[in-house]
Regions:
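Hydrophobic single-pass membrane-targeting/anchoring helices
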Residues: 1-38
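Solvent-exposed, non-transmembrane segments of extracytoplasmic/periplasmic domains
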Residues: 24-193
């Protein structure tokens, strides 16, 4: 799955409008309770139905129990059975302009990297006190069988690295996708790699 000029996002969706588009603007991600910067000892509790994935790429986050890990180049994916839901993570050096510029460049390239790209928007926000950007869009999917998809993608810089977490799902499952996305982002921690 690809996205943006640096391929930050997790896959395309159909040009048809979503069946159940979010009814509100993207919310700002909630920072965790007040505390110091994440460390290797920082832990987050996975909600019921989730497990904490301590990834060898240097992070941990909560993923649904039945999601399996797959490395694809510079990205790590946690995939649902049948790959209906794709939770992706990319860790990279910071890029010029920070998260908002990265997501804006990716959104500008959306039509060339995500077939049928539409309804893309980038919102500046914060994540755990760090400047961040949320990119949300719909697209056709990579194949007719895959069908229309919707993607939520949050990018931020922390500790000299750029982190990108996204969830891509069928447009008819945006509510479930948003839950997976929110849990992943809210439980994400940098760990010793």
């Amino acid at each position: 799955e690809v996205g943006g000029p640096t391929a930050w996002v997790g896959g395309p969706a159909r040009a048809a409008p979503p069946h159940n588009p979010p009814t509100t603007r993207p919310r700002q991600t909630r920072p965790p309770p007040a505390r110091g910067p994440p460390t290797a000892s920082t832990t987050h509790t996975a909600p019921s139905g989730y497990r904490t994935a301590r990834d060898p790429a240097g992070f941990s986050l909560a993923v649904p129990q039945d999601f399996t890990r797959e490395r694809q180049g510079e990205r790590v994916f946690y995939l649902s059975p049948g790959q209906t839901f794709r939770l992706g993570i990319k860790v990279a050096p910071p890029e010029t302009g920070g998260p908002a510029a990265v997501m804006s460049r990716a959104a500008a390239d959306g039509p060339s990297t995500n077939p049928g790209y539409h309804d893309g928007r980038v919102t500046e926000t914060t994540h755990a006190g760090h400047p961040a950007a949320l990119w949300e869009f719909s697209w056709n999917g990579f194949s007719a069988a895959e069908g229309p998809r919707h993607t939520y993608d949050l990018c931020w810089e922390e500790g000299g690295r750029m982190y990108d977490v996204w969830v891509s799902a069928p447009v008819g499952k945006v509510k479930e996708a948003r839950e997976y996305f929110d849990v992943a982002v809210d439980t994400f921690s940098v760990t010793a790699s």
